[in-house]
């Protein structure tokens, strides 16, 4: 099953401001989500249940970044909401 990848807000601009190598690594990792966004298939993805029962998915990208995304199974969309350096991701979401 193939999904379409959607970047939330201004993520495209943020990604394009990164160094070339980092940008390639992030784009390659995000592209893999189109084929299989679900955590069961690879260890770099995880389903998180946040406070209030909100579900979000996490993708480790290299050792430097984490992408947070949602999956719309009905529309076959992967909606990337945020890409953060690992340290910021840990501070913001705190427990993983």
Segments (PLM) and residue ranges:
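Residue-level signal for beta-strand positions within conserved beta-sheet cores that form or flank
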Residues: 1, 55, 76-79
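Arg/Lys-rich, positively charged N-terminal/basic patches that mediate binding to nucleic acids
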Residues: 1-31
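Short alpha-helical linear motifs
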Residues: 8, 48-52, 68-70
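Enriched for short, Lys/Arg-rich terminal
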Residues: 13-16, 61-96
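Generic structural signal for secondary-structure transition and capping sites
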Residues: 20-23, 35-38, 88
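Hydrophobic beta-strand residues in large extracellular and virion-surface proteins
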Residues: 26, 33, 78-80
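A short, surface-exposed loop/turn module that caps and links secondary-structure elements
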Residues: 32-60
